[in-house]
Amino acid sequence: MINDGDCVLEVGGHIGYVTQIFEDLVGGNGLVYVAEPTPFSRYFLAKNVSSNTTILPIALSDVSGNMDFYIEEFGGFTNSLVSEFTETSSKWLKASQNKSVTEVKKIKVDVNTIDLVSKREGITPNFIKIDVEGAELSVLKGAEKTLLSVDALMVEISQDHEEIYELLYRKKFKAKKKNGNLLASHEHAGGNIFFYK
């Protein structure tokens, strides 16, 4: 799905675990763009990536501007534009780790769309990875034009399953689970799903 020289857009980079894999796959001739709005995560992301990666200090959605962004202070694993998602995940993290406090705080972040970022940066991504903790549908709605030329995506689907599948099927994508099994057109699985043309 990702070849040497490709351009990858990673939406939700956290601290760069997956970004490093993308760097290896695209090689020295490829490009990786990673959107990460959280200052704490971005600090470590910058330390973990190489010179062929461009860090975009923004969130991606279906609008441009400035929005509230919710951060759980356990490790930043469930930071999101969707407050309910972060609050629910924060409670689960608190219980699973026997922590007495897992705070959720709200910050303001710059927001843009994939279509506008692709145009501004002059890129045509071959592959897009979306891991945005409940905001997947909004990100995809902001990528209507870009999706026409994308070869493949990996979307971690947390909610809005049916709408996400319908949007991507309209764009002629097929869906596979991470184990490689093709999904039937009526099957709307969650988790990490690969879409390809």
Model-derived segments and their meaning:
Residues 1-197:
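Phosphate/nucleotide-binding beta-alpha loop and adjacent structural elements of enzyme active sites
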